[in-house]
Amino acid sequence: MRRNEASPGVHTSSIVYRLASPGPWSHIRRAWAVTSKDAAQELRRRVALAAVFFFAATALALVSYAIGPFGLRPEDRAPVQAALLWIILFFSAATGLPRAFVREEETGTALALRKVTSGVLVLAGKTLFNYTLFLAIAAVAIPGFAILLEWNVSAPVQLVVIVVLAGWGLTAVSTFLSALVAQAGQKNVLFVVISFPMLLPLLLFAISGTLAATRSEGTTTAIQVILAYDGAATCAAYLLAEVAWEE
């Protein structure tokens, strides 16, 4: 039993060294090693993942009573539903995404990662894991939202595109900000205070695109803006990753 409970630092170093051997694909292997490490840690604990999904389920239940079949009239629900969906997705993600780098500081594995790989690759690996987590949250929350609130989407394919693209921007920014607040005192509060203004433009166009998909209207403008935001956020995170991770 004691043999299996290796320290987090040893576990982190062994994974990165094993998968980061020199070669043409070494960068991809290093980023994937970080993703695998985070996934293994979360699956082993399950507490953080359970908290994220429990928050999403609780929010869905409360919202369904407020504006569901016994609340607002059907013709008045669409704008409120689009906004509430992204509020639920944002705060559900904010429950788990900030722990990307905070976890390394708390478990003492940050120093090991700094020694064996670059900040860009650490950020890439953690962003990939967080993006997978966001998609899992969306895959659970959106069907539940549609059932509990009797939400009808006229263009489901467009909705999926909006969620996938906006989810990447939300994840990229959140993961980068997690590196900035990892060593702060009030990490969770600081993360929400910093992230909301930066994510507000993305969330506004995500809500706009979701509403358009609900009404089978054009989503081209929303998708273009979200793509531009994703590109800018990804480039900024790439350029500043080393500074955020090392400092």
Regions found by a protein language model. Give the residues of each.
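Junction motif at the cytosolic side of a transmembrane helix
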Residues: 17, 231-247
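Transmembrane helix boundary and interhelical loop/hinge segments in multi-pass membrane proteins
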Residues: 42, 94-112, 127
